């Protein structure tokens, strides 16, 4: 089979002085950072959908890309051609993982029977490609939002037959993920929300999606899948308001249905932007709540109100993200999946490499900065000092529930407490972060 990316052998590390646009300047997979290989810290993945399914179309224009597998032809043969190119790309980019939705890799067909048959064939084909290339599956998922049947949601749909179709897709995609050795399974509810409350029963829809997630957990254990289940928060788009708004909202949902020990979150940077949060905030919140799982690494445009899915290029932003992740022990089953796409005007096929190479170098630099922050330990020391009072006898009695509200009030009165405010030193800490970023 003729190579699609025939002008490139493989992207390799050439160092910071390299001027080769098809080489890594900072991402060196075997470089040790805090005693661990860079590749093992970052666990990079490339996504199937933006990279091989999008044709460059937008709300105002038709597709601008010339992709051989997007031409008229027999659907399964085109899907196999797409898989051939995808795995050529994964191998040449030197990413250890990839991610997919069911209908990214397989034609949906005109019926449920066709869907199941097509997907079964493509799962076998993907298994062959994984074995040949050594590329592994970070996570799989089901697309329960694109087809018109999901206009009013999947698990939250007012029609139980639509709910049942979605259940079939999720069961099938979970089984496929398990068969392919996937390390996680993701659930993103793009249509799980509402456009108007005038025709929406919030309590009913919440009960539906809660039961759906409980059944997903039950199925995971039934088939012996050892990976992590992940919900991906997003506040809106395509739905006006989505039920998985942000990390805190997802945690509240999980607690309501007794799922907080079973499901974690896959956090996307651009979704944090849309929710009015920083990427750093969402990562830190997930870690604090004990539900951090994986990351969709990209960036949004703060001047635009939609999901632009651009490649991450900010070392400043991502250094703080990597600092939180590494400090918390790093990824287990999760990783950094590039849920990002080239721009509509980027029609050269090698633009796919330029986008990913820049993103991988960005995250490598961010990791190195995070390592300097951790090794120095100054930020941790200052935070510990700020909360040191809670290690006192009074602080520990409060936290351990040994004092009631009235008893604390009595203590304050008896000891004539008159605490004064201590500086938070925000500006000093911001300067310290800049030191790690820019002073070598």
Curated annotation (Swiss-Prot):
Isomerase recorded as keyword: yes
Please list the cofactors this protein needs: Mg(2+)
Q: Where in the cell is it found?
A: Cytoplasm
Respond yes or no to whether keyword Cytoplasm is given for this record. Answer: yes
- What does the Swiss-Prot or TrEMBL cofactor note state? Binds 2 magnesium ions per subunit.
Organism superkingdom: Bacteria
Q: Which UniProt keywords apply?
A: Carbohydrate metabolism, Cytoplasm, Isomerase, Magnesium, Metal-binding, Xylose metabolism
Residues engaged in binding Mg(2+) 1: 232, 268, 296, 339
Task: Tell me the active site.
Answer: 101, 104
Question: Which family does the similarity line name?
Answer: Belongs to the xylose isomerase family.
Under the heading HAMAP family, the entry gives: Xylose_isom_A
This one is known as Xylose isomerase
Q: Which organism is it from?
A: Enterobacter sp. (strain 638)
């Amino acid at each position: 089979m003729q190579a699609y990316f025939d002008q490139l052998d493989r992207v390799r590390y050439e160092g910071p002085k390299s001027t080769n646009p098809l080489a890594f300047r900072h991402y060196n997979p075997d470089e040790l950072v805090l005693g661990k290989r860079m590749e093992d810290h970052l666990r990079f993945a490339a996504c199937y959908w933006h990279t091989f399914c999008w044709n460059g179309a937008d709300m105002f224009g038709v597709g601008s890309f010339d992709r051989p597998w997007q031409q008229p032809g027999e659907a399964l043969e085109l899907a196999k051609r797409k898989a051939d190119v995808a795995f050529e790309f994964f191998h040449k980019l030197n990413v250890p993982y990839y991610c997919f939705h069911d209908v990214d890799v397989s034609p949906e067909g005109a019926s449920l029977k066709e869907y199941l048959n097509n997907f079964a064939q493509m799962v076998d084909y993907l298994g062959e490609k994984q074995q040949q290339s050594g590329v592994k599956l970070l996570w799989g998922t089901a697309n329960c939002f694109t087809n018109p049947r999901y206009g009013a949601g999947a698990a939250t749909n007012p029609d139980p037959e639509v709910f049942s179709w979605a259940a079939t897709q999720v069961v099938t995609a979970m089984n496929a993920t398990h068969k392919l050795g996937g390390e996680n399974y993701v659930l993103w509810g793009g249509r799980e929300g509402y456009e108007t409350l005038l025709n929406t029963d919030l309590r009913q829809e919440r009960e539906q999606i809660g039961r759906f997630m409980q059944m997903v957990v039950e199925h995971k254990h039934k088939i012996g899948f050892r990976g992590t289940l992940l919900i991906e928060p997003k506040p809106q788009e395509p739905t006006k308001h989505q039920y998985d708004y942000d990390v805190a909202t997802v945690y509240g949902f999980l607690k309501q249905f007794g799922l907080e020990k079973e499901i974690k979150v896959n956090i996307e940077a651009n979704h944090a932007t849309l929710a009015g949060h920083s990427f750093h905030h969402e990562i830190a919140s997930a870690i604090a709540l004990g539900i951090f799982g994986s990351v969709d690494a990209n960036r949004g445009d703060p001047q635009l109100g939609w999901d632009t899915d651009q490649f991450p290029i900010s070392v400043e932003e991502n250094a703080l993200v990597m600092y939180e992740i590494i400090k918390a022990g790093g990824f287990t089953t999760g990783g950094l999946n590039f849920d990002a796409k080239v721009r509509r005007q980027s029609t050269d096929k090698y633009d796919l490499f330029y986008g990913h190479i820049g993103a991988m170098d960005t995250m490598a630099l961010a990791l190195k900065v995070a390592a300097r922050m951790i090794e120095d330990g100054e930020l941790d020391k200052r935070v510990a000092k700020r909360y040191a009072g809670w290690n006192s006898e009074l602080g520990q009695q409060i936290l351990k529930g040994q004092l009631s509200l009235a008893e604390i009030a009595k203590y304050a009165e008896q000891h004539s407490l008159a605490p004064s405010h201590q500086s938070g030193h925000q500006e000093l800490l911001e300067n310290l972060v800049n030191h790690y970023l820019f002073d070598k």
